[in-house]
């Protein structure tokens, strides 16, 4: 699926605003483990772990063909995960940067459900999906390609 979305550049101040929105929502829940999806959910996962003092278990799913703006998407694939057997019977929070088609989230939920957690919550900085059950920094109706501060190219490759 090739995309041609409008581009929205996010600075660190905007990121912090979105993360605070999520923290305020998550504080009301009983979460035992954070499960960020690498790479996109890594920074949000670290932020939540620091602010909420929660243990973290990472999983890695690959979906975009490249990390370039308006990249093509492939089928979501589970690449690997860290040992997540400890989530059995626990309330977990999956962390992702953006959710649009929900393909990555569906794969993550299916994979994690095999370990029999008690409850699975989802947190995302930007929710472009029709699902309003997700904990969102911001719910958006119009799809955009979001460029987070940690994704900006600091040095251009000459290759």
Name the predicted role of every residue range.
Residues 1-159:
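PRPP-associated nucleotide enzymes
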């Amino acid at each position: 699926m090739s995309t041609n979305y409008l581009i929205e550049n996010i600075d660190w101040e905007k990121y912090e605003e979105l993360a605070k929105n999520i923290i305020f929502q998550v504080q009301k829940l009983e979460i035992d483990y954070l499960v960020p999806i690498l790479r996109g959910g890594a920074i949000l996962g670290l932020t939540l772990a620091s602010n909420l003092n929660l243990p973290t278990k990472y999983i890695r799913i690959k979906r975009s063909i490249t990390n370039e703006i308006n990249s093509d998407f492939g089928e979501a694939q589970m690449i690997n995960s860290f040992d997540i057997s400890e989530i059995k019977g626990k309330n977990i929070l999956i962390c992702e940067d953006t959710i649009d088609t929900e393909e990555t989230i569906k794969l993550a939920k299916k994979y994690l459900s095999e370990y029999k957690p008690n409850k699975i919550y989802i947190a995302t900085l930007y929710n472009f999906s029709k699902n309003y059950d997700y904990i969102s920094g911001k719910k958006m109706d119009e799809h955009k390609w979001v460029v987070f501060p940690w994704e900006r190219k600091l040095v251009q490759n000459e290759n």
